[in-house]
Amino acid sequence: MPIVSRKIRQLNAKAVTVSGLAAGAAFVAVLETDLRLTGRNVDDLMILGRPFTEDPSKARAVGMAIHVVNSLALASLYARLEGRLPGPGWVKGAIFANVENVILYPITRFEDVHPAIRTGQVDRYFNWPAFRQSVPRHIAFGAVLGVLYDRLRLG
C-alpha cells in the first residue's frame, strides 16, 4: 500500500527572516519597557545568556544572540502552522506565541539550577507575576510575526 505523502508548503525565506527578526525586536522592546515599569527583573536575555558567561553585560549580548536564533526558529515553525490557526495574522501570531509560552513556561520550575537566579542577578520566574509579565512580550512577538509574515509571504 503506498504511503500518502503531503506536499510540504515551501517556506518564503524572506518572509520568515524579516518577520522573525522584527518579532524578536518587538519582544525585546516590550521586555525592556516592562523591566522598567514593573521593577521586576525578569530578564529573558540574561536567562538565555548567563549560563555561558558570568559577566552580566556579556550575558545579555549572548542572550540576544540566542534570542535572535530562537526568533527565526519560531518564525519558521509559525510559517508551517499558521494556516491551521484562526483569525487574521496578528491573532494567529498572538495565539501561536502564547501557546509556545504556556508549553515552555513549566521549565521555569527548575529555576534553582540557573546561575543568574542563584546569584540574584534576575528575579525568580516560577510565579504568577513573572508569568503575567511574559504575556505582553509574547503578544507583541506574535502580533508582529503574524502581520509581517502575512504581508511578506503574499506580496
Show which residues each predicted segment covers.
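Short amphipathic, positively biased membrane-proximal segments
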Residues: 1-155
